Structure formats: C-alpha cells, structure tokens
C-alpha cells in the first residue's frame, strides 16, 4: 500500500496536519520540536502524523519552515 502524504489546515486552531495515515488511538504522541507534535506507530516508532501548532505564525516568521525530521520522499508509482 502506498503511503501518500496528506496536508490539512485547521484555520480556527491554526494547526497544519501532515498525515501518512488516519490518526488512531494506539499511536504514541511526542513533542519533537517547539510545538510540533509527532504521532508515532506504537510498534515501529515511525512518524505517521505531524501537527504543527501556530502554523500561520511560523510561516510568516520562519522561512523556510524546517521540521526536525529526516525525509525520504519518493514518487508513487
């Protein structure tokens, strides 16, 4: 199964969600940076979801926006 990134923005909460899969109850949460929350697979420890709090403020003040994670992006084929 392909793991595609989806991006959602909650204007009211000012949160950017980056998802590999839907959020589920068994995931572990960890703050990996200044108000950046990672939701981890409980078995593998891999990041499955990110929540970037106060996104519009960050985007306006910090460019480029950097996340404290390694990324291996590939085209879905």
Regions from the language model: what does each represent?
Residues 54-77:
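C-terminal structural segments of small proteins and small subunits
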Residues 7, 38-39:
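A residue-level detector for well-ordered beta-strand positions
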Residues 23-26, 54-56:
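Short, surface-exposed beta-strand-loop junctions and turns on beta-sheet-rich folds
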Residues 10-11, 41-42:
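Short, acidic, Ser/Thr-enriched surface-loop or helix-capping motifs
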Residues 32-35:
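Short, small/polar residue-rich loop motifs at catalytic or cofactor-binding pockets
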Residues 15-20:
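Short, aliphatic-rich beta-strand segments
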């Amino acid at each position: 199964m392909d793991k595609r990134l989806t991006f959602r923005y909650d204007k009211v909460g000012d949160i950017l969600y980056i998802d590999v899969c839907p959020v589920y109850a068994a995931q572990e949460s960890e703050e990996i940076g200044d108000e950046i929350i990672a939701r981890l697979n409980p078995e593998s420890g891999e990041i499955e979801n990110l929540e970037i709090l106060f996104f519009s403020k960050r985007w306006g003040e910090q460019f480029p926006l950097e996340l404290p994670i390694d990324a291996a992006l590939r085209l879905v084929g």
